[in-house]
């Protein structure tokens, strides 16, 4: 089954950055407990622009789809109050295998 991911761009004002990072760090702990991964990258030319990559094994287990604990929902809402997410932030992407097809 292919891995599923989102690539969410978010603009975070400098005054919110420390809180944004702490909130995402806390959310990562919940994700890791479920076998999910979250990576964060900062744009090299625009220090207020970040991209959150969130990966899970299935669509239904992804943070954009899965039912979650109330604590996680609060953290997600907090993140959305600290930054401005791009409109396509929660589009799901599925992994494409580049392995050579096997002959039968």
PLM regions and their residue ranges:
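Long, compositionally biased, intrinsically disordered segments
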Residues: 3, 21, 25, 35-43, ...
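Active-site-flanking beta-strand signature of metal-NTP-handling nucleotidyl enzymes
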Residues: 3-11, 51
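Short, surface-exposed ligand-recognition loops at beta-strand->loop->(often short) alpha-helix junctions
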Residues: 10-22
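Non-catalytic surface loops within mature trypsin-like serine protease
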Residues: 12-14, 56-58, 94
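An amphipathic, aromatic/His-enriched active-site/gating alpha helix that lines ligand/cofactor pockets
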Residues: 26-39, 55-91
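Short acidic/glycine-enriched loop/turn segments that link adjacent beta-strands
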Residues: 45-49
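Short, low-order "capping/linker" segments at domain edges
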Residues: 88-104
